[in-house]
């Protein structure tokens, strides 16, 4: 097992929490690494956060590889996760493995895919062939057009049992990590307790082994943030004020300063 991953597994056993951010480029990856963040996810959410799209479905494998390379160059010792985008892995294990290799060649340590027990054979195939897989259940954004909206999952007894079964099947298949998104806190806590691999929560309460937030959300760079996100600063306002000051100084001939020679 990769020594970085082994450290995460040991931290789960010891009750030590890990902090992950979703980032898409070198400058933000470098800031995260310098701040002591433990993991960086190169998410297909780049299609929404930096691409302005309404969902993640238009993101390509080539785009994911490009952004993964940028993040890796700034990530330092952070564990780097990268998303397999919609359409790059659902046909079967062979397609998923080939797509995952592309992201590994871009520098990713772990490749993430969405889906429950139906993806267990794909997880096993990739794991047996040298790919570290992070599974993702609960709210899986790549299915938004099937559901019609981004909605919480596991809120009734039947769906909660199904998600618990999914978690067990994916862990048994060899997944190294499991993302739990937008599920009830108690369900996330139960799954975290029941499986040996580290869980990473987003909108899933405080009891997962790690938490992940989009770096733009926690820095206050977007106009809106998900209800589970915390804006640690109003970075967008600070940046707008700086840009407005630049515009003012240029307009008043204060910048650049006049040189004597």
UniProtKB/Swiss-Prot annotation:
Coiled coil: none annotated. 3-methyl-2-oxobutanoate binds at residues 44-45, 83, 112. Binds 1 Mg(2+) ion per subunit. It is found in: Cytoplasm. One of its GO terms (molecular function) is magnesium ion binding. One of its GO terms (cellular component) is cytoplasm. Its main location: cytoplasm. Keywords: Cytoplasm, Magnesium, Metal-binding, Pantothenate biosynthesis, Transferase. The active site is at 181 (proton acceptor). Its cofactor is Mg(2+). SUPFAM superfamilies: Phosphoenolpyruvate/pyruvate domain. Its EC number is 2.1.2.11. Pathway: Cofactor biosynthesis; (R)-pantothenate biosynthesis; (R)-pantoate from 3-methyl-2-oxobutanoate: step 1/2. One of its GO terms (biological process) is pantothenate biosynthetic process. NCBIfam families: panB, PRK00311.1. PANTHER family: 3-METHYL-2-OXOBUTANOATE HYDROXYMETHYLTRANSFERASE. Homodecamer; pentamer of dimers. Catalyzes the reversible reaction in which hydroxymethyl group from 5,10-methylenetetrahydrofolate is transferred onto alpha-ketoisovalerate to form ketopantoate. Belongs to the PanB family. This is 3-methyl-2-oxobutanoate hydroxymethyltransferase. It comes from Acidithiobacillus ferrooxidans (strain ATCC 23270 / DSM 14882 / CIP 104768 / NCIMB 8455) (Ferrobacillus ferrooxidans (strain ATCC 23270)). The gene is panB.
